[in-house]
């Protein structure tokens, strides 16, 4: 029974040399496998594999012993491996040593002096460089030249017999560019050049193009005009819609305001009728109370003066203060006509009717023309009756007038008061 090693079952290395015998055996094996697997690609002869084919050899036969290599084979492989590794190490070490030697090269030169005749050695060492330092020399970008088609160089033919004809010269002649609209330098252009330019222009078949361009421009103008008309119509329609919407909004707001005003008036008329009546009665009572308080505070003279003013009469202070004393004339017990004759004799004029003045005493004039001596007495009487007192202390300043009357202030204070379970109502604002 012949045994094979486990390494023989493995495939050969990728870069190993293949001998003829091994190649032949491998080809034979591959052919056998191909015949087994493919068998001319017939489906009825498919390979049949069993589970025992996948079981290792050691598990198939426990008593199987693997043959170990002999000592001679081991020594031989050891020598080959060592020689190969030594060759690799020597190559690697030689490269490293050469790089180190190149780094540590020291250049020594002997310099001899002429005078002394002595020599001295100079040690030249390469300057150390930082490997991380960027490159100092400038790297220029190499520009690739553009691949332009070079103009052909036309040489004059040496053959004198070949001459261009007039037609060829006319074809190659390019007239100068002359504008019909601009001549800034003021050159005088000959008629020949003008005619040549016009002839070149007329030779070009531009009639069809011009007609087409005209049709295109007219169509574009018509389309633009129609588009503008449509836009204007849309804008007018939008404006009309906006006007209608604004009118509707205004009418709705006006209607709402009218309804609110009517509701407010109805509430004032119906809901607050009793409150309005009560307010009127309360105001009347307040006015009567204020009039009574004002009349109580007034002096007698002021009362009389006020009464006379209400009646349309003007009464002096003496009459008001009862200081005027009219002349008390006694009742005459005789007829004044008895003295008419004597009076008429004394009278300066014959037309005099009365023989003496109506009031003989002139004190009646003192009622309206008080004397200077009685002014002090009258002033004392007026001060006593009017309860006027002189100022003994500083002047009391009152609050600034807020533009409201006293009646309005009292009414506001009365509104601010709350009695019992009354609920203050906010005034309606229209």
Curated annotation (Swiss-Prot):
Composition-biased stretches (Polar residues): 1-26
Top-rank lineage group of the source organism: Eukaryota
Name of the molecule in the record: Pre-mRNA-processing protein 45
Main localization category: nucleus
Pfam families, per database record: SKIP_SNW
Family of the protein in this entry: Belongs to the SNW family.
Single GO BP term: mRNA splicing, via spliceosome
GO CC terms of this entry: spliceosomal complex
Role according to the record: Involved in pre-mRNA splicing.
Record's subcellular location: Nucleus
Assembly information from the UniProt record: Associated with the spliceosome.
Source organism (scientific name): Kluyveromyces lactis (strain ATCC 8585 / CBS 2359 / DSM 70799 / NBRC 1267 / NRRL Y-1140 / WM37)
Region (Disordered): 1-28, 280-299, 370-430
Keywords tagged on the record: mRNA processing, mRNA splicing, Nucleus, Spliceosome
Alphabetical list of InterPro entries matching this protein: SKI-int_prot_SKIP (IPR017862), SKI-int_prot_SKIP_SNW-dom (IPR004015)
